[in-house]
């Protein structure tokens, strides 16, 4: 049985923080590959065109053989839901033990996800805390245990692992904001991604 991790998200744009999280998952958990899955229609966000986000992901991950980018959501109609993504990928990759990489804030909302109670036991959850440090790790672990308790009340089990990652104070929303006002995003994103953003005028008033 192979062990694969899904890293789903808007990735608008992908940045070094995302890449560090995926690399930490590879190093700390016995998985063979990380499958990056950009959301076609995120349920709570307005995002740049799917083709741009997919292209930036491909540029950022192309030099790591343990990273692969999936366009499984490309032809999906309606809102992108995690359980549909996992079901579709399970058809493409049978006989797989699945992991799902997710940020702590997002994991905290899992009990409220669409069919979240059904999704929770279908994979192991790899949690990226917002901050790294003694107190923050303890707080992150407490939040994960609270999610587990909420799901247990609904007769569901869940397995989670807290990833240990370097502190990176960067987010996609910060990058978009900086770029929109003409500030540098060099070293916040891979250079190929920065060039792509400039070439396609993303995150500006005349963006494609």
Swiss-Prot record:
Class in the EC hierarchy, top level: transferase
Identify a single GO molecular function assigned to this protein: ATP binding
Q: Which GO terms describe its biological process?
A: NAD biosynthetic process
Statement: the UniProt record of this protein carries the keyword Nucleotide-binding: yes
Per its UniProt record, what Pfam families does this chain match? CTP_transf_like
Q: Which family does it belong to?
A: Belongs to the NadD family.
Described purpose of this protein according to its UniProt entry: Catalyzes the reversible adenylation of nicotinate mononucleotide (NaMN) to nicotinic acid adenine dinucleotide (NaAD).
HAMAP family, from UniProt?
Answer: NaMN_adenylyltr
Q: Can you say what this protein is called?
A: Probable nicotinate-nucleotide adenylyltransferase
Origin species: Trichormus variabilis (strain ATCC 29413 / PCC 7937)
Gene behind this protein = nadD
């Amino acid at each position: 049985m192979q062990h694969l991790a899904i890293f789903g998200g808007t990735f608008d744009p992908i940045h070094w923080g995302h890449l560090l999280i995926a690399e930490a998952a590879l190093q700390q958990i016995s998985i063979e590959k990380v499958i990056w899955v950009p959301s076609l229609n995120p349920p709570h966000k307005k995002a740049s065109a799917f083709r741009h986000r997919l292209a930036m992901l491909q540029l950022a991950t192309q030099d790591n053989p343990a990273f692969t980018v999936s366009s499984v959501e490309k032809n999906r109609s309606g809102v992108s839901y995690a359980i549909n993504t996992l079901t579709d990928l399970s058809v493409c990759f049978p006989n797989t033990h699945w992991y799902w990489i997710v940020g702590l804030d997002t994991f905290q909302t899992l009990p409220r996800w669409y069919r979240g109670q059904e999704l929770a036991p279908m994979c192991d959850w790899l949690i990226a805390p917002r901050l790294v440090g003694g107190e923050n790790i303890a707080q992150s672990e407490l939040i994960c245990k609270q999610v587990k308790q909420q799901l247990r009340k609904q007769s569901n089990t869940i397995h989670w692992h807290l990833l240990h990652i370097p502190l990176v104070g960067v987010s996609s929303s910060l990058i978009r904001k900086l770029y929109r006002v003409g500030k540098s995003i060099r070293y916040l994103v891979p250079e190929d991604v920065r060039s792509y953003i400039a070439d396609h005028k993303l995150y500006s008033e005349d963006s494609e």
